[in-house]
């Protein structure tokens, strides 16, 4: 008597395609894309002046831990984890432009390596290494690998969380694998809450596997519950602050979705090329295509939908973490369409040449502060060259944010100028904004010379708060005015000081 039992269909496993790959090839799988992203990001790393947001990073990283924690209770909680990480980094390596941007560069390079590993698991070795290379060539990867903000770290965290989910699905009964996935996902949420929208793609993948093993829902649910326990209090705090931080982001219309790829890729040509390759993606299993397609499409659609409420969250940089998904699909498409390495390499070279103008553009001196370029460094050089002991300074805070921080960053640290109308610094009040002197006349201390820094080329006294301008006009005259890109640097001398007025 023969008893026949029907076996369940095999699980769609995502194991590395390394059976026929020599050890050197396994290393090159991730090391090649990592090195490429590192090299591209390192080129021109310090060429652009710090942006306003990067100046906030510098300011926050320079505060002690207690002050950072107190500040994020009031504002910018969504970046609190990043500020704490940067505080530790700056303590060790200083606050030069190179030092501030290196963590982002390392994260972007690491993300390229993880994308290659993901591609190997999902689509095979060729697709994996091509995906990593294509990812490294995307101009936005270099752009945000050169910015002292959290976005490159978020890309790495999302890619790593996805890789760890695949490992957990390989051995779903292994609790430590689920714990590793939960940890990576929690870090993702702590770095940027919107990036947790990638969970929609993860749930799609779990759903495919749960048809064969319903206990997967319990294991995945426990992992997500652990993430929620960590992130929800943080999310509630951030939600209470959005009115202060995102009031300026407009609600998106339908055209915003159409133009989003060009913004996310930092290259319309690059976006078009990778999307075209992504449409050619092929897989014998549906799960890889489902995962990557959901990862690429669902988060932007979700963010677009919720941005029609009280607050809009729709910015290209907020969904930058979808780039790995597009690179994975494009790597699969290229591997399927071009069977030989030589043919695939020709496509990669063509893409690099097509995106070269965008790569050059993002390394321009004022690109990080576009569309309002402000040459903080040139303004600081004017003051450094001509200052005298006892000089004071007035910054345009009327319609310009972080102009003061930018000039202070590029001034020599030993050069201290009294900020005439500053009552309390942001660090003193656990905020990002200063408190200014309520009665400007009372804040003038009789300095013979005051440097006035204003945005634009208008008459300097017209660019600052009217009450401050009135107080200065009554006692000072403009001795010299020097224009640098986006700014005017004026030297005021007390009316009883010697010297004739001149313009330069």
Describe these PLM feature segments:
Residues 497-504:
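Short, charged/polar, Gly/Pro-enriched secondary-structure boundary elements
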């Amino acid at each position: 008597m023969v008893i026949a039992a029907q076996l369940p269909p095999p699980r769609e496993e995502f194991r590395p395609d390394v059976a026929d790959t020599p050890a050197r090839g396994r290393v090159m799988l991730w090391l090649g894309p990592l090195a490429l992203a590192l090299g591209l990001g390192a080129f021109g790393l310090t060429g652009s002046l710090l942006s306003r947001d990067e100046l906030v990073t510098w300011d926050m990283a320079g505060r002690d831990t207690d002050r950072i924690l107190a500040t994020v209770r009031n504002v910018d909680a969504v970046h609190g984890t990043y500020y704490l990480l940067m505080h530790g980094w700056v303590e060790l390596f200083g606050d030069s432009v190179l030092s501030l941007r290196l963590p982002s560069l390392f994260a972007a390079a690491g993300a390229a390596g993880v994308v290659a590993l993901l591609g190997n698991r999902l689509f095979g070795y060729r697709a994996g290494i091509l995906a990593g290379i294509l990812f490294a060539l995307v101009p936005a990867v270099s752009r945000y690998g050169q910015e002292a903000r959290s976005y490159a770290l978020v890309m790495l965290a999302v890619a790593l969380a996805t890789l760890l989910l695949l490992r957990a699905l390989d051995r779903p009964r292994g609790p430590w694998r689920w714990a590793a996935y939960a940890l990576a996902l929690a870090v993702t949420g702590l770095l940027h809450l919107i990036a947790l929208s990638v969970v929609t793609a993860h749930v799609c993948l779990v759903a495919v596997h749960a048809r064969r093993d319903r206990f997967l829902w319990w294991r995945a649910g426990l992992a997500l519950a652990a993430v929620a326990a960590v992130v929800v209090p943080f999310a509630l705090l951030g939600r209470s602050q959005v009115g202060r931080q995102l009031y300026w982001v407009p609600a998106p219309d339908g055209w915003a979705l159409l133009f989003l790829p060009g913004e996310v890729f930092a290259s319309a040509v690059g976006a078009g090329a990778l999307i075209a390759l992504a449409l050619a993606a092929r897989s014998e299993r549906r799960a890889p295509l489902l995962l990557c397609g959901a990862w690429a499409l669902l988060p932007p659609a979700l963010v677009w939908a919720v941005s029609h409420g009280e607050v809009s969250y729709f910015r290209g940089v907020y969904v930058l973490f979808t780039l790995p998904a597009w690179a994975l699909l494009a790597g699969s498409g290229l591997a399927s369409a071009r069977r030989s390495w030589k043919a695939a390499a020709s496509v990669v070279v063509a893409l690099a040449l097509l995106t070269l103008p965008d790569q050059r553009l993002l390394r321009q001196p004022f690109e990080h502060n576009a569309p309002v370029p402000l040459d903080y460094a040139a303004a600081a050089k004017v003051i450094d060259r001509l200052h005298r002991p006892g000089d004071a300074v007035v910054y345009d805070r009327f319609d310009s944010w972080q102009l003061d921080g930018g000039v202070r960053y590029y001034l020599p640290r030993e050069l201290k100028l009294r900020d005439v109308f500053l009552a309390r610094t942001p660090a003193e009040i656990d905020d990002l904004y200063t408190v200014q002197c309520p009665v400007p006349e009372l804040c003038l201390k009789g300095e013979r010379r005051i440097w006035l820094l204003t945005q634009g080329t208008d008459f300097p006294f017209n660019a600052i708060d009217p009450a401050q301008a009135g107080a200065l006009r009554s006692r000072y005259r403009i001795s010299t005015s020097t224009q640098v890109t986006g700014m005017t640097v004026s030297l005021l001398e007390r009316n009883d000081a010697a010297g004739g007025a001149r313009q330069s």
